[in-house]
Structure formats: C-alpha cells, structure tokens
Design a protein with these regions (language model features):
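Solvent-exposed helix/loop surface patches that form functional interfaces
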Residues: 31, 88-89, 93-204
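Short, aromatic- and cysteine-enriched interfacial helices/patches
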Residues: 3-5, 22, 72-76
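N-terminal, post-signal-peptide region of Sec/Tat-exported proteins
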Residues: 48-84
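Generic structural detector for well-ordered beta-strands
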Residues: 37, 49-53, 86, 111, ...
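C-terminal segment of N-terminal export signals and the immediately downstream linker at the start
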Residues: 24-45
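Short coil/turn motifs at secondary-structure junctions
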Residues: 41, 68-70, 90, 102
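Short, surface-exposed coil-to-beta transition loops
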Residues: 45-48, 78-82, 104-107, 173-175
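N-terminal secretory signal peptides and thylakoid transit peptides that target proteins
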Residues: 2-19
Length: 204
C-alpha cells in the first residue's frame, strides 16, 4: 500500500503505494494525480493520494496515505505515510519517506550513486542494483526490475507476472494484484495482509 500495502503487517508493499521506475508514457499522459479509497475487509479505513509534478525529463511523485483501523468506535491502528520520489529521464534518482505505523516511526532515503542505489533505512545501509525501484504500484514497468520496500528500505523477494493486459500479480513477500486502465494509469489494487485480512484500493 503504501498500504504500504505496503502497512498493516504485509506492510507497505503497497505502499505504499511511491513510485516506479521507467515512467510509462501512458501513465504520465494520464492523470497528474491519483486518489484511492482504501478498504480493509470491505470497510473503508483511509485514503492514498499520489501527485505528479514535472515531465518525462524530471518527474516528482509525492505520496500521502492516511489510514485508521477501528474496533467498533475505537481506533486500534493508525497509519500515516509520506514519500517524495524523483526520476530523471525516466530513471530512479531518489526517494525520501517518513512513516508513522501505529506510533512506530520509520524513515528511508535512497539515491542513485556510483552505479548503484544506496538505501538508508532503520536496519542500516543497503546497496541495491542500479536498476532497482521502490514498489509503489502506479507504474507497472517497474515490475520487471528488482524492487525494494519504500517504508522499510529492504529488498523484496517477489515474483511478478502479467496475468492479462492491465492486470499484474505480485507474489512472495507481498501478495498483491494491481490493475491499470486502458491508458496505463493505476486503477485498483487487491492484497492480503499478514493477519489474513483483505485490503483493496479503489480509485476515486
């Protein structure tokens, strides 16, 4: 997601969700902003918003996600995620994220440097391949590259497969399906969290 779905335990692979690698021209020609209502087991828990600025030469994608899970009227889980990703010539350049996951603060920064991507995260510093990308779902072209989690900074052990035009499946550390409209823009997401609950993004 950012939820994360990439946030309740299958954290923020959705997330969460921030942005993907080569920018599909179709995706950029489409909306300059995407907003999703987020549901857990059919109950709306929040919203996920991505705003795009710039063009193919220099693009900035800013993500904000806010979610609250309640037990009756009582909030039992609160989640807030903010991310700014920059791409130059369609290639990943940098990412900065700040997440509050039910009181647990996590910060990640990543940037291209010296033919690799250096990721600073809560667990330390990770060197990722130069073609790696954060998994943020709005650009399906990144599904053919190594992926890292925008909330934790960790490399993901996943396989990706195009089921049919406009439908991609991610399996492994994350269990997520993404759909895209005829113009290539992110349309919806369905996933499963560690506790077995179902998460769904619906574009609004």
């Amino acid at each position: 997601m950012p939820l994360d779905l990439g946030a309740l335990p299958r954290r923020a692979v959705l997330a969460g969700g921030l942005a993907l690698p080569f920018l599909a021209r179709e995706a950029l020609a489409a909306p300059r902003a995407l907003t999703f209502a987020v549901f857990r087991n059919g109950t709306r828990i929040g919203e996920h918003h991505i705003a795009f600025a710039g063009d193919d030469a220099t693009l900035t994608a800013t993500t904000d996600a806010v979610m609250t899970v309640k037990l009756g009227p009582v909030p039992v889980f609160k989640y807030r995620h903010h991310a700014v990703e920059k791409r130059v010539g369609g290639v990943f350049a940098s990412l900065v994220t700040a997440t509050d996951s039910n009181g647990k603060a996590e910060r990640v920064s990543a940037e291209m440097a010296g033919g690799a991507i250096r990721i600073s995260c809560p667990s330390g510093t990770i060197t990722a391949p130069a073609n790696a990308n954060p998994i943020t779902h709005w650009n399906p072209q990144v599904f053919s590259t190594p992926l890292f989690h925008p909330q934790t900074g960790k490399m993901l052990k996943v396989t990706t497969r195009r089921i049919e035009p406009g439908h991609w499946a991610i399996r492994g550390d994350a269990e997520i399906d993404d759909w895209y409209d005829a113009g290539g823009a992110w349309l919806s997401l369905k996933g499963k969290l560690d506790d077995g609950s179902a998460v769904e993004y619906r574009r609004v």
